[in-house]
Amino acid sequence: MISAGVDSSDLAKRGESLIRQSSNRYLTTVRIAFRAKQRRFDDFDGLLEESSVKPVQRAIVELSDEQDQPDLLPG
């Protein structure tokens, strides 16, 4: 999913895509922040492997993947 580091230009493109395709920039920002907070606590609980990727970066990548490939979502 995410390699040891995230390419900053790719991350910027993903973030711009999330904002551009949203109807409400504020809610998109809140979704990213909420997902990042969840990932940070998952890291503290030891549920995820040690990662050099910051929670906000991981949240942007995950939400971007969910937006671009909705058929990958469970359910």
Curated annotation (Swiss-Prot):
It catalyses: RNA(n) + a ribonucleoside 5'-triphosphate = RNA(n+1) + diphosphate. The keyword Nucleus does not apply. One of its GO terms (cellular component) is DNA-directed RNA polymerase complex. GO terms for biological process: DNA-templated transcription. InterPro entries: DNA-dir_RNA_pol_omega, Pol_omega/Rpo6/RPB6. Its EC number is 2.7.7.6. Coiled coil: none annotated. Keywords: DNA-directed RNA polymerase, Nucleotidyltransferase, Transcription, Transferase. GO terms for molecular function: DNA binding; DNA-directed RNA polymerase activity. It comes from the Bacteria. In cyanobacteria the RNAP catalytic core is composed of 2 alpha, 1 beta, 1 beta', 1 gamma and 1 omega subunit. When a sigma factor is associated with the core the holoenzyme is formed, which can initiate transcription. HAMAP family: RNApol_bact_RpoZ. Belongs to the RNA polymerase subunit omega family. Promotes RNA polymerase assembly. Latches the N- and C-terminal regions of the beta' subunit thereby facilitating its interaction with the beta and alpha subunits. This is DNA-directed RNA polymerase subunit omega. It comes from Parasynechococcus marenigrum (strain WH8102). The lineage of its organism: Bacteria, Bacillati, Cyanobacteriota, Cyanophyceae, Synechococcales. The gene is rpoZ.
